[in-house]
Amino acid sequence: MKIVDINERLAISGQPNTDEFINFARRGYRSIINLRPDGEEPNQPGNDAEQAAARRAGLAYNFVPVIGTSITEADIQAFQRAIATTEGSVLVHCKSGTRALMLYALSEVIDGRMKRDEVEALGHAHGFDLGRAVTWLKRQAIQTPRVSGFFDPRTGSIQYVVTDQTTKRCAIIDPVLDFDEKSGATATTNADAILAHVEQQGLTVEWILDTHPHADHFSAAQYLKQRTGAPTAIGTHVTKVQRLWREIYNLPTLSTNGSQWDHLFADGDVFNVGSIKGRVMFSPGHTLASVTYVIGDTAFVHDTIFMPDSGTARADFPGGSARALWSSIQAILSLPDETRLFTGHDYQPSGRHPRWESTVGEQKKANLHLAGVDETTFVALREARDKTLPMPKLILHALQVNVLGGQLPEPEANGRRYLKFPLNALEGAAW
């Protein structure tokens, strides 16, 4: 196995045997980054075996599985983090070394340390063909809009800033207000990171959009509205969710006309992010109110379709329906195959890095709940799986905030805000 030194900290290689890891440590490497998805070849060691070998050799280890034809910015960010968090020399491997050098080149271009027209020469200098990296950069240059994802590890949620590069106007989608259920503390760490990005990029926020009332985190829509002045919006069927949860929470004074948001979108409504056209697709199933935002060549599909290796979202919340979810997913998959899909959650199966971008074509081909599956099979699979899933730990905390558009309950006489829990309201939920 040939090791190619790229710089003083980074080397790349093809697939090593696990018994070589101890020699890597002796040669001064401090970390191994494995870029190969499990199952690429029958005889590859795989993530578990490599992690164990790294531990025995005293090496740090990161699993960042990528496919050369579907690398996303989330993959590049994970590659950068894996290198940045390691002191000393790093050995990155895939099958041949090409993906490793491709990720390095893309990282350098995105961060401005390398020009796009220098990528091919970098590959030739080290004996690799980086044609795919050149193609990736050309494709990225014409994609509209520009999408930046912000992953919240506490809830597995992804928040988005969707930008029209021409006008520097943007929309924020599904922002998270931090909440610690053990202490009852709230914070704005996630939202402030989004605001910092907006400021750094010189953007004007045009919309603050929620895809549905979330059951696993508080919405930061109201906080961001206060900070930016941008209007908030959600799908018009949120009123059905408000009526449903008004009864569950016994909140007779809760207004259920959606007035907590500045705008309610109906199915088919259109809007703009700068000069880019957007439209709204009603996408029920996960909740009664779920919508998909189609903006330029992207669709923000919330809790309908997860990444292909994760499948689809649950449909057993009050008002949910696996059959309705199937119909919503089929409408999303009727978009052009090259449409970029951005999911609402990622739970990092097999310990991989967070990912959130795919395409319609990739989902049709590889989603483990959808590829080669008909409606009857999907509904049976989804309903059976949902019976085994415990409720999200924040569902009763989050929904009483999110049916108010992200507004916290009003302070009581002592100046404190309180949440209210119904007992035994979610009958049949798994523990």
From Swiss-Prot:
Its cofactor is Zn(2+). Pfam families: BLH_phosphatase (PF04273), Lactamase_B (PF00753). SMART domains: Lactamase_B (SM00849). It is an enzyme of class 3 (hydrolase). Its EC number is 3.-.-.-. One of its GO terms (biological process) is glutathione metabolic process. One of its GO terms (molecular function) is metal ion binding. Induction: Repressed by BigR. The keyword Protein biosynthesis does not apply. Substrate binds at D309. Coiled coil: none annotated. Probably part of an operon that comprises bigR, PD_1892, PD_1893 and PD_1894. NCBIfam families: bifunc_ST_SDO, TIGR01244 family sulfur transferase. This is Beta-lactamase hydrolase-like protein.
